[in-house]
């Protein structure tokens, strides 16, 4: 699909986003989320101004909700909810009761006679997701700096890293790894700067300009990443969460200057907008095609994906914020610190 088709799709999508924004379900946002017990898991989401319960399809491995069954969740006149279950020959209804804590946050739901807890996320409490490091943070940097980067064979293009802020001043930077506001809880970069290989940087600027008519701009969380930082990620991250970090034995696309982590900000307010999960949140909600949340969140992701695809970027399935430039394989792994660029 070329960039012109992608931009037309993005424009149509944005019209739907505006319609939903004007009618939304703000009062019921608290109900949206991931619920589960004893291995069973389901989502409650908003779609077209209505609530739905999504149940993972049978025989689907993992918890990604790549396929699911959806059921309407309707609010009655007395404020209670009913789940509408449709079958080949009949329709049944089940009462749904939500539970709240002292702060009026939803903690669980009763379906029939079973109670399911609602999963909590750091972003919902104004916090940043953190891992439980597998090694002491104090020794991670020294170990990574002493490690040897993998040797690659083949011909590569000469690196031409350029600083993104110099390419377009309207790009916002929120380089989390230059602060302790990240999943590791410690600064990993000595400077809050962002670099990409020149063709990727130029394509990213075009996306940022295309977003203007939708009222958005790009916010950059990470771009080129020295290899030693990828090594730190890997050594610190628990085995079950390694799907969210690159194996240093292969290197990251960030290490080549061919990947970028981004979100959207409002050009009206200058503030980042809600994309349905926090950046670097190691959870189901981070998956690019996560079907939960509300329509605006999902459509913002789709708008970003469409415009980025039109300029040669592909989204990483497990991370809505991560995009790889088409030519990332053409560049070598790099371990150059920012102050040397």
What residues fall within each predicted segment?
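K/E-rich alpha-helical interaction surfaces of small helical-bundle regulatory domains
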Residues: 30-41, 308, 312, 319, ...
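Extracytoplasmic cell-surface/polysaccharide-interacting catalytic and binding patches
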Residues: 126-221, 236, 240-318, 327-341
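Hydrophobic helical h-region of N-terminal Sec-dependent signal peptides
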Residues: 13-18
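Bacterial N-terminal signal peptides that target proteins for export
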Residues: 2-12
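Beta-rich nucleic-acid/ligand-interaction surfaces
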Residues: 227-233, 323-330
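Peripheral terminal and inter-domain segments
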Residues: 25-135
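N-terminal signal peptide c-region/cleavage motif recognized by signal peptidases
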Residues: 21-22
């Amino acid at each position: 699909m070329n960039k012109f088709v992608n931009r037309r799709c993005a424009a149509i999508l944005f019209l739907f986003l505006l319609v939903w924004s004007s009618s939304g379900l703000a009062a019921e946002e608290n109900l949206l989320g991931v619920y589960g017990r004893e291995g069973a898991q389901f989502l409650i989401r908003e779609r077209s101004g209505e609530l739905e319960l999504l149940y993972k399809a049978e025989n689907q491995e993992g918890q990604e909700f790549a396929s699911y069954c959806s059921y309407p969740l309707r609010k009655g006149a007395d404020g209670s909810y009913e789940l509408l279950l449709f079958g080949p020959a009949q329709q049944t209804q089940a009462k749904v009761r939500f539970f709240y804590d002292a702060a009026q946050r939803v903690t669980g739901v009763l379906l029939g006679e079973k109670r399911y807890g609602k999963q909590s996320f750091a972003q919902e409490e104004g916090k940043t997701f953190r891992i439980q490091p597998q090694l002491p943070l104090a020794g991670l940097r020294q170990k990574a700096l002493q490690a040897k980067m993998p040797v690659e064979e083949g011909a590569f293009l000469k690196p031409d890293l350029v600083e993104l802020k110099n390419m377009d001043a309207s790009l916002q930077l929120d380089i989390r790894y230059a602060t302790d506001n990240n999943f590791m809880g410690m600064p990993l970069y000595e400077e809050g700067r962002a670099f990409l290989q020149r063709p990727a940087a130029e394509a990213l600027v075009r996306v940022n300009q295309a977003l203007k008519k939708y009222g958005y701009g790009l916010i950059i969380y990470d771009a080129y990443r020295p290899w030693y930082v990828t090594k730190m990620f890997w050594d610190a991250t628990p085995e079950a969460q390694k799907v969210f970090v690159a194996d240093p034995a292969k290197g990251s696309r960030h290490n080549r200057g061919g990947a970028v982590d981004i979100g959207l900000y409002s050009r009206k307010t200058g503030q980042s907008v809600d994309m349905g999960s926090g950046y670097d949140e190691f959870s189901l909600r981070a998956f690019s095609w996560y079907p939960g949340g509300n329509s605006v969140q999902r459509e913002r992701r789709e708008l970003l994906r469409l415009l980025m695809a039109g300029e040669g970027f592909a989204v990483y399935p497990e991370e809505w914020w991560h995009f790889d430039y088409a030519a990332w394989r053409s560049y070598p792994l790099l371990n150059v610190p920012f102050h040397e660029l």
